[in-house]
Amino acid sequence: MAMKRKKISVIGAGFTGATTAFLLAQKELGDIVLVDIPQLENPTKGKALDMLESSPVLGFDANIVGTSDYADTADSDIVVITAGIARKPGMSRDDLVTTNQKIMKQVTKEVVKYSPNCYIIVLTNPVDAMTYTVFKESGFPKNRVIGQSGVLDTARFRTFVAQELNISVKDVTGFVLGGHGDDMVPLVRYSYAGGIPLEKLIPKDRLDAIVERTRKGGGEIVNLLGNGSAYYAPAASLAEMVEAIVKDQRRILPAIAYLEGEYGYEGIYLGVPTILGGNGIEKVIELELTEDEKAALAKSVESVKNVMRVLE
């Protein structure tokens, strides 16, 4: 039987979706289908063709097509959902909820119809609630519907730590728990630089400032751009998650997973450390938390639940 490349569909061909498609192709993780609404079909085809024409120069083998027809996504191994309206300055994440929930439901119906065995990674904000929507709408098992926020939030945290210490980001590890919003919980106790606990290297007031900047990281970029939101780091984070699944790497990565009692929460999608591999979310890793961390996580869960109430 002939070996086949993996097929990865990216729904939403805006800045994040297109950048994600380009990174996935460069990493040769599979053939890419970039999808957007019919009104944007030609620009989507144009972006895909432009990427494809870079392949001889960059030296990657991957087919990239643009389309508005979900039939072209048939039998995808992984589907990444970036579609939705973007957050504008002054707009709360909650303002996004109702519009993006409708979009998630429409997209999920089409995805499931054509790729009933795929893994779905959701980026659309507010991402905890949108991942839950896709999970419910798809009827897929929990390991196959995953939200992206922690890889990005942790990347921001690691960036700021590396800048503070003037060291390589490669030597900084960290974890961010909870919802993707102002109440996320960067776990400083479980964060290291070259194996040394950050608390031994950075004074508490500076660490607190880094934690606060991480929480506001998305908003900082929204305000600087003036129009639109971050897309390079979110796309890179999605690509890292796709790679972990496609290559069955069993990476320990923070991801938005469906909890069934872990950390004391049930029936909610929340950012937690996971093992991400060929079977999607293979395990949720439970860390021991201090009372302060538990309280911060509870506050984060409350924020997610408040957004979820808008869904109902």
Curated annotation (Swiss-Prot):
Keywords: NAD, Oxidoreductase, Phosphoprotein, Tricarboxylic acid cycle. It comes from the Bacteria. The keyword Phosphoprotein applies. One of its GO terms (molecular function) is L-lactate dehydrogenase activity. Pfam families: Ldh_1_C (PF02866), Ldh_1_N (PF00056). NAD(+) binds at G12, A13, G14, F15, T16, G17, D36, N100, L123, T124, N125. The active site is at H180. Substrate binds at R87, R93, N125, R156. It catalyses: (S)-malate + NAD(+) = oxaloacetate + NADH + H(+). The keyword NAD applies. Its EC number is 1.1.1.37. Transmembrane segments: none annotated. It is an enzyme of class 1 (oxidoreductase). One of its GO terms (biological process) is lactate metabolic process. The modification Phosphoserine is found at S149. Gene3D superfamilies: Lactate dehydrogenase/glycoside hydrolase, family 4, C-terminal, NAD(P)-binding Rossmann-like Domain. Catalyzes the reversible oxidation of malate to oxaloacetate. Belongs to the LDH/MDH superfamily. MDH type 3 family. This is Malate dehydrogenase. It comes from Geobacillus thermodenitrificans (strain NG80-2).
